[in-house]
């Protein structure tokens, strides 16, 4: 109890001293701001006089002003003339000035009358302000040394002393109160109030706001500051009470982690509530309170800027994916440890920051010549591509469409298959040759589907049948159908260019669900085989159209059909999924926010119908899996270049683990025979692995030198090596299965990027010596896939494949050189001539010294085998050992000359004590037993004499 009272008195004394020092700081600050307010009032008084002088000059001419001033002087008689400001000529001549413009003296001498309003003699007042600032700085320095740092850190309050430079610059700035922005920025709960920043100029109505004084503003700041410190003081006392109540004898500085987390949450909640009460006292309505509370919550959750996320070297492209940034920082870290001669000799180059393995594009690209409109002369009608009256052409189109809806569309469900086939069979064949907007739009969507399917078809290796578990729907194109494609080698690009021209033209002045679907098809095509900027721009078109049509409100015009509601709902969620996942894979922040709560509830209802009643025939099961992943990404993707804190990391792992348990069936990741039969079905699982690896690879930055701009809190991370390695094993087993099925070059874009990420992780772990056995096996599987890809001959060889291999081999080369140099340095300095293991051998056992030649020394294995037969023949003789009396430490000496063995001592024990006869018989039997002392039981009695305290 005395310890608790002492701790309580210490805390009370500390809080009282803190309160006294805080009051001193408040008084000094109030004095300073009162002085500043007087200076501001005088500045505004001079400004008003200047405006009055200009008005007088504009209203009357010089003669009128002269007459007026003369009359005024006559009325005043000999009274002393006092003015606030003299003109330059009067000051130079050192004569009285009447303060008019022009003044009387300048009018008499016909000189130009000029006033200098900037030159104001305020030396005395400036000295007062400077002294006040010095007092504040001195008090701040004394307070900062003695102020409890834990209270300031827990309350997120930073007290900055105003400097002379701030005070002097404030008077010359357009806004004299601009230095108050700095004070408000130091208080986290002030960042959300726009009306905290006041101005001395005019208000919204154009009137001068002379009623806003700095001391009023400072009073509000100090009110909230005191409430914030009060909450921290209460929290500190409560925490101390809980700790002492739980364990009186425990160290008061050691707090249970669970209790500290609960106290931290309580502190956050109480701070938010008290801040809301302080703001309510300032006449802020409930809506503003909600906004400010949310901003306070975001501020309390310490988010620090990431020291790793960065731009590309020569482009305004910000990267948030850690696997794209990690090679750059690794290269910089290793090159610092190598000599310039070694770098030049080995031709080492630092890997650049880029999106490694963006897609599997290659072979042929879109050739952008100025504008697609320039090619309109060569593309006038769709009849140049296919003849829909020809049965061979029609059969080829049907096979391509069937492949798209079976192998590509189920992942994102951009197109409603049932509606498309209905329009294709009923409307398109009848209106295909008509020149109207509806027919052109549907034709464009058809051509986008065909161009995407042709690109996927080229990813299959001709004449090679896969041996893996994944299968893919074969087109089974006949020779006549294949000859049509051979005669038109650039048909894919021409189909896309025609569709892009029509859609871009219609988007110029129209909005519709079909245009949203068209832009999503263009986004998918660009994600497959073109650049990131083109993909982002196409995705932005779809997002802007969703926002422009307000699909997120889940509201409809008065005249609409039931199917319009379905189209609006599905188009929005499809755009939402692609926006979140493609933006995440691109390393950019998403553009489309979550919709109204009604749409989320409806989404859950549709999901239940999808899995239970099969009522939704638009979205597939894979689409709902991608939807759940996109919602997870929305919660944890940071816009302002921030890393996840500890709590967010744990929440992310929990939600991803729930997704894995829900949708991925089976404990073995390579048993896809029952779950994954087609290649498209594994895309949600690969997206899950991509999200996992992207966030978990951040822990590898701990193995390299931290950045100079790194904050201590930004380096805090829950490292889980086993989790990262297990997901690397899942990814590499899945990629190996894809490679065995000869489907690696089918342009699903995560194939190459995931292989690069897993291989990069293994290289870093092997260099650091972490989980060497597991990473060796994963590394071996990666090398087998790389060799297979290098030996393969696809029609469109990925252009980013050499980039990924070069980066991995360059980093591996750097690692090998640094390890070799380190090994040579260690061998040269410390040496490796360690000799045999004699110094490493144990010299003492539990209760004796190793190597004693006594009865307890065990014979080695060879002697046991040689004497085994002898012990069996003479068991009685073999049981005899050297008597314990021969040991000096077991011998009891009397009179310094007679040595009595333990046997005789036990035998004579009963005769001296007068024990009964039956007891004496038992004692004699024990004394005559040859096994009692041979087992060396009494030698262990020395163990009880040891001090284990």
Curated annotation (Swiss-Prot):
One Gene Ontology cellular component: mitochondrion
* Keyword Transcription regulation attributed: yes
**Under what name is this protein listed?**
Probable transcriptional regulatory protein STB4
Return the annotated DNA-binding positions. Answer: 87-113
Please list where the region (Disordered) is annotated: 164-214, 862-888
Any idea what job this protein has?
Binds to SIN3.
Q: Which CDD domains match?
A: fungal_TF_MHR, GAL4
The annotated regions of Low complexity compositional bias extend over 164-178, 200-212
């Amino acid at each position: 109890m005395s310890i608790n009272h002492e701790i309580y008195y210490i805390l009370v004394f500390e809080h009282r001293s803190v309160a006294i020092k805080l009051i001193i700081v408040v008084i000094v600050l109030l004095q300073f701001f009162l002085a500043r307010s007087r200076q501001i009032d005088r500045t505004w008084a001079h400004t008003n006089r200047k405006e009055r002088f200009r008005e007088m000059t504009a209203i009357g001419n010089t003669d009128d002003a002269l007459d007026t001033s003369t009359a005024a002087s006559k009325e005043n008689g000999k009274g002393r003339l006092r003015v606030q400001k003299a003109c330059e000529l009067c000051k130079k001549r050192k004569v009285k000035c009447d303060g008019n413009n022009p003044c009387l003296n300048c009018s008499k001498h016909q000189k130009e009358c000029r006033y200098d309003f900037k030159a104001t003699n305020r030396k005395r007042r400036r000295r007062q302000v400077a002294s006040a600032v010095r007092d504040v700085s001195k008090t701040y320095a004394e307070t900062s040394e003695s102020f409890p740092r834990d209270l300031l850190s827990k309350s997120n309050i930073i007290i900055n002393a105003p400097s002379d430079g701030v005070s002097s610059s404030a008077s010359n700035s357009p806004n004299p109160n601009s230095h108050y922005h700095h004070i408000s920025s130091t208080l986290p709960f002030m960042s959300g109030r726009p009306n905290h920043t006041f101005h001395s100029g005019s208000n919204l109505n154009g009137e001068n706001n002379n009623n806003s004084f700095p001391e009023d503003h400072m009073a509000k700041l100090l009110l909230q500051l005191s409430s914030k410190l009060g909450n921290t003081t209460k929290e500190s006392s409560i925490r101390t009470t809980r700790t002492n109540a739980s364990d009186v004898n425990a160290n008061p500085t050691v707090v249970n982690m669970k209790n500290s987390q609960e106290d931290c949450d309580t502190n956050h909640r109480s701070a938010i509530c008290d801040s809301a009460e302080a703001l309510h006292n300032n006449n802020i309505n409930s809506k503003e309170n909600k906004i400010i509370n949310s901003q306070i919550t975001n501020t309390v959750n310490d988010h620090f800027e990431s020291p790793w996320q960065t731009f590309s070297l020569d482009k305004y492209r910000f990267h948030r994916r850690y696997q794209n940034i990690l090679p750059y920082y690794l290269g910089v870290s290793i090159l610092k440890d190598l000599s310039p001669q070694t770098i030049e000799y080995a031709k080492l180059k630092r890997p650049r920051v880029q999106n490694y393995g963006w897609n599997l594009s290659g072979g042929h690209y879109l050739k952008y010549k100025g504008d697609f409109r320039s090619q309109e002369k060569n593309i006038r009608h769709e009849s140049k591509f296919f003849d829909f009256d020809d049965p061979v052409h029609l059969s080829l189109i049907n096979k391509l469409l069937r492949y798209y809806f079976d192998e590509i569309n189920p992942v994102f469900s951009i197109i409603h298959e049932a509606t498309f086939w209905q329009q294709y069979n009923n409307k398109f064949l009848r209106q295909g040759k008509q020149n109207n907007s509806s027919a052109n739009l549907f034709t464009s969507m058809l051509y986008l589907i065909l161009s995407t399917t042709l690109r996927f078809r080229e990813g299959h290796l001709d004449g090679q049948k896969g041996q893996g578990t994944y299968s893919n729907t074969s087109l089974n194109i006949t020779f006549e159908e294949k000859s049509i494609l051979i005669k038109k080698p650039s048909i894919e690009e021409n189909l896309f260019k025609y569709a892009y021209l029509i859609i871009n033209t219609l988007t110029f002045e129209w909005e519709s669900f079909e245009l949203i679907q068209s832009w999503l098809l263009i986004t998918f095509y660009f994600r497959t085989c073109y650049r990131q900027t083109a993909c982002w721009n196409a995705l932005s078109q779809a997002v802007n159209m969703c926002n422009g049509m307000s699909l997120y409100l889940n509201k409809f015009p008065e005249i609409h059909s039931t199917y319009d509601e379905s189209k609006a709902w599905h188009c929005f969620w499809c755009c939402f999924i692609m926006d979140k996942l493609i933006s995440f894979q691109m390393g950019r922040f998403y553009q489309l926010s979550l919709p109204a709560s009604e749409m989320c509830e409806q989404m859950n209802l549709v999901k239940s119908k999808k899995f239970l009643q099969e009522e939704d025939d638009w979205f597939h099961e894979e689409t709902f899996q991608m939807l759940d992943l996109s919602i997870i990404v929305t919660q944890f993707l940071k816009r302002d270049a921030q890393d996840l804190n500890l709590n967010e990391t744990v929440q992310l792992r929990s939600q991803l683990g729930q997704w894995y348990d829900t949708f991925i069936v089976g404990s073995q990741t390579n048993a896809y025979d029952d779950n994954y039969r087609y290649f498209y079905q594994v895309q949600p699982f690969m997206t899950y692995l991509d999200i996992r690896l992207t966030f978990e690879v951040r822990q590898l930055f701990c193995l390299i030198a931290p950045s100079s701009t790194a904050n201590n809190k930004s380096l805090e991370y829950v490292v889980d090596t086993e989790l990262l390695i297990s997901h690397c094993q899942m990814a590499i087993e899945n990629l190996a299965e894809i490679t065995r099925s000869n489907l690696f070059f089918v342009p699903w874009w995560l194939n190459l990027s995931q292989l690069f990420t897993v291989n990069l992780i293994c290289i870093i772990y092997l260099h650091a010596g972490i989980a060497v056995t597991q990473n060796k096996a994963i590394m071996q599987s990666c090398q087998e896939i790389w060799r297979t890809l290098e030996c393969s001959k696809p029609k469109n060889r990925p252009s980013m494949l050499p980039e990924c291999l070069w980066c991995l081999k360059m980093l591996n080369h750097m690692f090998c050189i640094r390890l070799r140099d380190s090994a040579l340095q260690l061998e040269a300095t410390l040496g490796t001539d360690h000799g045999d293991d004699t110094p490493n051998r144990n010299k003492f056992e539990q209760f004796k010294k190793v190597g004693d030649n006594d009865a307890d020394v065990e014979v080695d294995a060879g002697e046991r085998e040689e004497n085994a037969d002898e012990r069996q023949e003479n068991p009685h003789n073999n049981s005899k050992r050297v008597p314990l009396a021969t040991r000096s430490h077991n011998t009891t000496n009397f009179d310094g000359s007679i040595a009595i063995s333990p046997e005789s001592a036990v035998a004579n024990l009963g005769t001296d004590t007068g024990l009964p006869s039956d007891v004496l018989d038992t004692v004699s039997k024990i004394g005559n037993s040859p096994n009692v002392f041979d087992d060396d039981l009494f030698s262990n009695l020395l163990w009880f004499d040891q001090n284990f305290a």
